[in-house]
Each structure stands twice: as C-alpha cells, then as structure tokens.
C-alpha cells in the first residue's frame, strides 16, 4: 500500500494585533493569500493597505497588524464561536444571518450554462493535486469569461480564502465577480462571498439552506448542480428571471 496519495495537511496560525485569532488546518501553499483572504472575508480589512502581515521565520504562521478601530468594529458585532460544517479553520465566528440587513443589489447577470460548464472544466484541468491524490477542494474567481485566480486546498473554505486573497494582494477588484467551488456551499462560505461583494457562487454540489438565506438577504445567486444540464438557482433572482 502506497502513501503517495496522502493529502498534505498542516496547521498555520494567525495573530492579529498580538492576540491569537485562528489556526487553519490547510494545504501549505499560497499562505499569504490565505491570510489576506481570510482577513478580508471576515471583515478585518478592506484592502492590502489595511494590514501589515509578517510571516514567522521559525514556524508556519503570521503576525498581522490592523487599525484598532477595525478590530473594535468586529468585536462590536458580538460574533459567536461556531463549529462550522466545513473543514479548515479550527474555529470560526458567524453573525446571525436573520439579523443581517438586506443588501439591495442590481439583478445578477449569470454566464450561460455551457459557459459555466466550461469554466468548471478549466478549473478541474488546473487541479493537479486532485488528479494526483483526490480528496482536495478547488476554488476560482471568474468574470464569467475566464478564471482570474484559482487555488486548491484540503479545506474548501481555505481554497476560497486563497483566491480572494490573491486578488486582495494584487489590488484587484473582487466585487461583482463570480466564485466557483467544488464542494457544497455552506453558510460560512456564503458569508465570505457576500462580504467580498461576490454576486454569484456556483458548485457541482448544492448549497445549504442557511447559505441560501444569506444569499437571498445579500442579493447573491447560488448555483447548485452547476455542471449538470439543469443547474438549480437559489437566493436572489438573477437578471431576466420572473
């Protein structure tokens, strides 16, 4: 029996303003992107200019310094620690979606079904770790025509943080883009996408009911069974619906 097919997993920690905040169990690549994407998706930063990120030279981890006002605003949300359904971060904090304000956005324009399938085909072709081992998740940000960033990780939320962080690092606009994921769309993933201004999220799998509620309240469309002939739309109504 060979060990070649084992998926690499390692802990990576993050401290913010001197306090331990999160530890990821993750695939150890694109770690700066992972940290930036997580901070952006959780509302700690709006851009790379909001943070000073220093890697530890003796361990896999980062020290981040952000404006204290940002940290106080997060604390004021009274987020509760939650054991999330996804793999990746050891701890996560979610606000109550039922209490979140409804975000009014223009109707979302979705790519045609065949174009969506082609985008996923490209993502799967880029999945070298998946081909080598299986048991890995992938994510990509797209403008509907091409993939702008992609990543693989043992945790699907980590893969999303990595692609968001890639655009944050390169000072590229995330709002208005679409997100491809290979696993189910959980509440945590929907929160991350909504905070980033992503307008639609697609998966070959399905979204959770709480993810659908988050999408509905934030004007976001979730696309389940995206590589099938008849994708299922959830959340906000896309342009041309009705």
Residue ranges of predicted features:
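Feature captures the catalytic cores and cofactor-binding loops of soluble hydro-lyases/lyases
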Residues: 156-233
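Generic structural hydrophobic/aromatic packing signal, biased to beta-strands
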Residues: 14, 64, 87, 139, ...
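Short, basic/aromatic-enriched C-terminal tail that caps enzymatic domains
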Residues: 230-242
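Histidine/lysine/aspartate-rich catalytic loop segments that bind and position anionic ligands
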Residues: 126-172, 178-179
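Surface-exposed beta-strand edges and their flanking turn/coil or helix-capping segments
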Residues: 27, 35-40, 76-80, 154, ...
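Short C-terminal domain-edge/linker segments immediately following a structured domain
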Residues: 44-46, 54, 94-98, 170-171, ...
